[in-house]
A protein has these predicted regions:
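Extreme N-terminal leader/activation tails
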Residues: 1-57, 73-80, 112-132
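Charge-dense, low-complexity intrinsically disordered segments
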Residues: 5, 9, 62, 99
């Protein structure tokens, strides 16, 4: 298995884990009604949970399961695009469109992996490459 294949597998596994967590949380949107500060409500209007520390409720509501699932879906599109051309993503890419596409998508996928740098399976060699 090549390094790029391992990189794709690592990011896919993290997205799968995140999806499982979002689905376990109900998979739906949350909101913070202005009339009840500190409460986060689900789509039906029921209190999903409450948090009395000012400001956290809005941040948490923006990280709702539905939004997380949307982000995961778009991340998978990028990951699938990269997987098609990952073999062309090398330290010294050719100067053609396909290699440039692979290199650019590889940069994005490496950034996605770097979000999980604290994970025991993360490899430092997956850090994004910077070239001039």
């Amino acid at each position: 298995m090549t390094d790029n294949v391992r990189l794709v597998a690592f990011v896919r596994a993290r997205l799968d884990e995140e999806e499982d967590v979002a689905r376990a949380a109900g998979g739906e949107g949350w909101r913070c009604p202005a009339e009840v500060p500190g409460e986060i409500h689900d789509r039906s209007g029921a209190i999903a949970f409450s948090l009395r520390t000012h400001g956290y409720n809005h941040h948490i509501a923006r990280q709702d399961p539905a939004r997380t699932l949307q982000r995961i879906e778009t991340s998978r599109v990028l990951l699938d695009e990269y997987a098609e051309v990952a073999a062309l993503d090398t330290d010294r890419p050719e100067r053609d469109f396909a290699s440039g596409r692979a290199f650019g998508l590889g940069f994005v996928v490496r950034q996605m992996a770097a979000e999980h740098a604290g994970h025991p399976e993360y490899q430092v060699k997956w850090l994004p490459r910077f070239t001039q």
